[in-house]
Amino acid sequence: MKGHVARKRFGQNFLVDQGIIAAIISAVDPKRDETVVEIGPGLGAITEPLMARVDHLHVIEIDRDLIARLKKQHTPERMTVHEGDALAFDFASIGKNLRLVGNLPYNISTPLLFHLAEYVDVVHDMHFMLQKEVVERMVAEPGNADFGRMSVMLQYRFYLEWLIDVPPESFDPPPKVQSAVVRLIPKPVSELNAKSQEKLSQVALTAFSQRRKMLRNTMKTLLSDAAFTELGIDPTCRPEDVSVEDYVRIANYLS
């Protein structure tokens, strides 16, 4: 890639497939006056078509070389460059009704998704390019081997939609993995039934800490067989066979 060498420590793989870029922009369908935030703009594959559709774009970038390039190419009137790590960024500082977009660095995608889940109150929606394996875990249903803590926590908080599959040759350099684009829309408060999201997270973390064992064994410090009976949940189930709704019921029972 002319002028910039992709840095492994930042997980940089730059999107170059114009067809995929167009499909992402079409899926996002940004409007002029919306607050759009791009995480990791890189060399601008998504940035440029986004800027053609919005009055002002916020970008979050950690690579100093790319920050300098962005500031040289765009005026502050059109673009606000937030310098730093998206994992530590306060998204609420930008405003509300944020539309987040990004080809997320695959080496930090999981912790970044959990970080972003803390800002659902200020987010309208999110469209992200991720490792396909991560998207499979996000949308997995109970009974599927991919169903885990991430599935529980993200499905509790968001409506998820798998939009586009993206092959390695769509990037420069090509990653060694398949990719996919996913849409996340925060659920309304009326659909969030957990008394404590922290307790739900603790329950999911405990349950999936030994995912091949029965719930009775993984959760013995939290629930007795009598409690499982009271909840109507089979204690001999494995963690991946329990629905999001049942994890919420367990968390509420313990809250």
From Swiss-Prot:
Gene Ontology, cellular component aspect: cytosol
One annotated GO molecular function: 16S rRNA (adenine(1518)-N(6)/adenine(1519)-N(6))-dimethyltransferase activity
Residues that coordinate or bind S-adenosyl-L-methionine: 13, 15, 40, 61, 85, 103
Family: Belongs to the class I-like SAM-binding methyltransferase superfamily. rRNA adenine N(6)-methyltransferase family. RsmA subfamily.
Protein's name according to its UniProt entry: Ribosomal RNA small subunit methyltransferase A
Keyword terms of this UniProt record: Cytoplasm, Methyltransferase, RNA-binding, rRNA processing, S-adenosyl-L-methionine, Transferase
Catalytic activity: adenosine(1518)/adenosine(1519) in 16S rRNA + 4 S-adenosyl-L-methionine = N(6)-dimethyladenosine(1518)/N(6)-dimethyladenosine(1519) in 16S rRNA + 4 S-adenosyl-L-homocysteine + 4 H(+)
Domain of life: Bacteria
Its EC number(s): 2.1.1.182
CDD domains tied to this protein: AdoMet_MTases
Localization (cell): Cytoplasm
Entry-linked PANTHER family: DIMETHYLADENOSINE TRANSFERASE, DIMETHYLADENOSINE TRANSFERASE-RELATED
Function: Specifically dimethylates two adjacent adenosines (A1518 and A1519) in the loop of a conserved hairpin near the 3'-end of 16S rRNA in the 30S particle. May play a critical role in biogenesis of 30S subunits.
InterPro entries: KsgA/Erm, rRNA_Ade_diMease-like_C, rRNA_Ade_Mease_Trfase_CS, rRNA_Ade_methylase_Trfase_N, rRNA_adenine_dimethylase, SAM-dependent_MTases_sf
PROSITE patterns linked to this entry: RRNA_A_DIMETH, SAM_RNA_A_N6_MT
